[in-house]
C-alpha cells in the first residue's frame, strides 16, 4: 500500500488514504521490480486500503476498504473487498460485510475459507467469523468461530480478536528463538 506523504499529521489524518499497488519480485535474486502498478487508486476512488492478502492460488486479493488511514478496525464503515487478479474486477464481499467494521482477514491453505475480524455482534468487541469462498471468489454466509459454550464464552469475553490467522498445525517454534531471529534481521530456518 502507498499514500501521499503529509507533513501535517496528525491534524489531517482523515486525508491519509492508502492506494493498493503491485510490483514484481524476483525471488531468486531477492529484488523488487521497477514498475509499480496501481490496482486501487485512493485519490481517485476516495477510500483507503489496508491488509491486502493474496489467495494461495494467486488469483484473488482480499483487502479492507475504509474512509481513511490504515487502522480499519476502528472504522465502522470498513468492509472486506475482493480483487480478481485475472479480470481486474473489484467487488465487496457483501455476505461477509455488516453494518459494523470488518477488518483483518486470513486465507485458509486451500484458498476456500477465510477467517476475519468483525464487530457485527455489538459494535464494540471484535469477534472471529469464518466464511467459505468459492472458486469464482464469491463469499458465502460466514459463521461465528465455534466455542464449546458460545453463550457463556462470548458474553464473558472482555477481549477482542484483532489479527486472526488460520494455521495448519500447532506452532512449535520457541518464542525466544523466533524473537532473536527477528531482531538479527538474518534469514533463518526455524524448523
Model feature map: region roles:
Residues 1-191:
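Sequence signature of WD/YWTD-type beta-propeller architectures
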